[in-house]
Amino acid sequence: MHRRNFIKNSSIASAGFAILPSGTLFANNKIVKVGVIGTGLRGQDHLELLLKRKDTEIVAICDVDEGMLLMAKKLFIDAKKPLPTIITGSNVAYEDLLKIAAIEAVIIATPWEWHAPMCIAALEAGKYVGTEVVLGTTLQQHWDVVQAAEHYKGHVMMLENVCYRRDVMAILNMVRQGMFGELIHLQGGYQHDLRGVKFNDGKTPYDSGVEFGAKGYSEAKWRTNHSMLRNGDLYPTHGIGPIAHFININKGNRFLNICSFASKAKGLHQYVVKKGGNTHPNAAVDFKLGDVVTTSINTANGETILLQHDTNLPRPYSLGFRVQGTNGLWMDINNSLHIEGVTEKHRWDKAQSFLDKYDHPLWKKYSNDAEGAGHGGMDFFVVNAFIESVKRKINTPMDVYDAATWSAITPLSEQSIQLGNQTIEFPDFTKGKWMYNTPIFALGDDY
């Protein structure tokens, strides 16, 4: 069955099929043959990591941007590695990459609107799929990817690197050891001034002008269009991924309801006017994305979650994590925590000594390997987990149900805002399997 007909015609008779559980096959010496779809700046990060590994061979790369392909080729030359097959020419050129039988796994690092169709095509081709966030742009796309993974018995891992951030993993270790007691409330989000990413001069990627779309470069070429046309939490997974692990979402717990609010939208217009002047054509653009989008979620086990998306205003970077339980809490903004009976009453304590004490076994084992990898080492861990899963032919530690659940917050938040901040029932992508699944993420120091 061709994927173009799959979504339309299939009734997904295998809707009850469970993604294959982790196995025991260990293949340390195996060389994984990889294809990379999307060689923009993020795709190049993945290429650099893969080129440093002894257990991967990059067979082919694909992009429609000749300039980005040239930059990607230089990475191979600098690493003294053979050049891969280079595939380009059209928006569907990736289909030719997927026809290469030798490729076992693909990494997708393209604009968001391409993630879902590329995931489905890769699943049909029998490849392991590692996709950059987000999974899709519509709720139906999320269901389509889940159903394709079930139908083709495939694996999709969202490459959410913040799940591997060192402090986040130490807190996960503390949560699992009961240091915070029973968890009650969690917060997180994406709070990052992206104005200099959403606009540039069309030649350099950051802080260089006020162009976007056809006149933009790199992310400004496509990402800003979402801020112009959509209003919701467009990038929820950096916050919700770690939170989901803290409270075992899809592994004995699930999201029940979601409600979102958006502030007025002023930041992007003001940025354009300040840098480009009132007469610049982009000063007349009506950006739909609220400057601060706030989302509330409740869960089957009774926790509450608060997410914030804040990318249009001047601010320092912070994901705004808060993990609060019956024994105390941690907040990342001031790197502080309070644990009843351990820290001084009614006072914050610096978190670092606790983070050191409860450093996750993965970081203890691989910190030297992660040194120099992107985003403070997080990128090493997320790519390593994906490649190790392919080598062992097992399910990935963050699976297609996780990808869909975390990423679906975007279209659900849009829907809630469009309906006047209505509370919406959260879909169960696992179709009840969440009640029987158990945690598999980062249980030891393996991967």
Labelled PLM ranges:
Residues 295-301, 325:
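Active-site beta-strand termini and strand-to-loop segments that position acidic
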Residues 72-74, 169-171, 196-202, 269-273, ...:
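Short aromatic-enriched loop/helix-cap "lid" or pocket-rim segments at secondary-structure transitions
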Residues 38, 42, 152-155, 162-286:
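Predominantly a Rossmann-like dinucleotide-binding segment in NAD(P)-dependent oxidoreductases
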Residues 10-13, 45, 244, 259, ...:
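C-terminal helical cap and adjacent loop that interface with cofactors, partners, or active-site loops
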Residues 284-297:
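Short N-terminal edge-element motif at the start of the domain
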Residues 1-131, 143, 147-155:
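N-terminal glycine-/serine-/threonine-rich beta1-alpha1-beta2 phosphate-ribose binding loop
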